[in-house]
Amino acid sequence: MIPDTEIQTALPALGQGNTAVITGAASGIGLAAAKRLALMGMKIVLADIGGPRLDDASRAVAAIAGDDAVLAVASDVSKADEVDRLADRAFGAFGDVSLLMNNAGVGDNPGKPWDNRDGWKRLLDINFWGIVHGVEAFTPRMLASAKPGLIVNTGSKQGITTPPGNLAYNVSKAGVKTFTEGLAHALRNEPGARLSAHLLIPGFTYTGLTEGATEKPAGAWTGEQVIDFMLESLVRGDFYILCPDNEAARPLDEKRMAWAIGDIIENRPALSRWHPDHKDAFAAFMKG
């Protein structure tokens, strides 16, 4: 693990006394980020749906950073006005914001696109539009500060390889990937290029709510491992923060992604990895 002093030297945005805003902060990766950044001396704004989990998370982070350095804001990221209000609260309480982690998301499976319009809309409103709302609300003021800043949007490997099973989730995370790529390009063309965007791509991560599991599966990483890897990647200047886990190392992910883009290049059927006519070819490709 990289020492905090080395991280903060490489990334002034994460310096002591600076402010991080984290959505989806009441549990999982978001809460792990809040605790880790609090240990680094940052002020923390935790945003999540209001309730006991957010209250508990706020107390846990305040035990590290102190009550005066923590602000909890009940916020539904699917609603632009609530994210605007979150930004007003964050800037009002702490002045500048130097890190925005758009991490809130849900893993609901609304099924086929032709039988559950409301379910699809809810998932996309949270997973995709929630990130757009965060960027809209915070970016202008982060740019105006003329200070170093970071925006980290949480995507998913499912937004890249798009496996069958939860099409709506895949669509939402594919949108996050494309949006964040374009955001990074736009920001690096701003005068001074002091604000950058990055795509966090977690692997199999145990959050305490993972598929109903009460104990961490052997193949999963913890949220804390994801955040340590994220910080190491940011120090390197990575845009794609492609996290491994205890089941899938990076070379395995790379081959799966290469096969997915190969569907276009080789003119194979969509999602050929799961097509019976290409099952053997995929297996041979993975072994090669």
Question: Where are the model-predicted features located?
Answer:
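SDR active-site lid
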Residues: 185-250, 261
